[in-house]
Amino acid sequence: MTFLFTPHSTSVIPLQGSDYVFPVHRIYCVGQNYSDHVKEMGGDPRENPPVFFSKPSDAVVIDNKPVTYPPATSNLHYEVELVVALASGGSNISVENALAHVLGYAVGIDFTRRDLQAEAKKQGRPWDAAKGFDQSAPTSAIRLVNGGNHPLEGTISLSVNGETRQDAKLSDMIWSVPEIIRELSLYFELKAGDLIFTGTPAGVSAVVAGDQISAEIDGVGEISFELVSN
């Protein structure tokens, strides 16, 4: 068998304190997983449960590299999120066994073309153009789980040009990490190399080219990069 053209390279993420890298298989994302964020977007947490969507694996940006402001939007929003990196997968995974599949955690930014998302919601259409564009998933190095130490209660925060915009607790999530893995595995066969962006707290807003974005999660790591002009 001969390839018609050279296959695209696999996106990889570095591991903290290791020469190994994590090959990305798929990127799953959870929306509406913090009550305060659901409310700031005009929803009701009791009527709007968390939802799943995805991004292409090559949306990942690593090593604090600059991120290019995307075309076709005038309202680009940041969303800081805890990212789960899976070492193994399966289907119908129980809540009790879910964390056994986790390799580690990272800090991620789910960039969103908010104007396109609002229009998609109004029309009842998918969010692909709003969520799955190039460089829409900057991600820090992955911190490996050591001795079962899962950082599920620390602080998650984001600042723009030194001003804090998002500041919350991971324990504020509606669905916990084990519950997210359980729910996803009902719909998809999860695999090693999958990333799961677990949702963002309140405080999202627009950014422009020239802004410096920094985010941190206790016990996981940090990420910092500049948003640059196209």
Question: Model-derived features: where do they sit?
Answer:
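Switch II (G3) loop of P-loop NTPases
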Residues: 200
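Catalytic-core "active-site belt" of small-molecule-metabolizing enzymes
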Residues: 1-187, 191, 195, 203-230
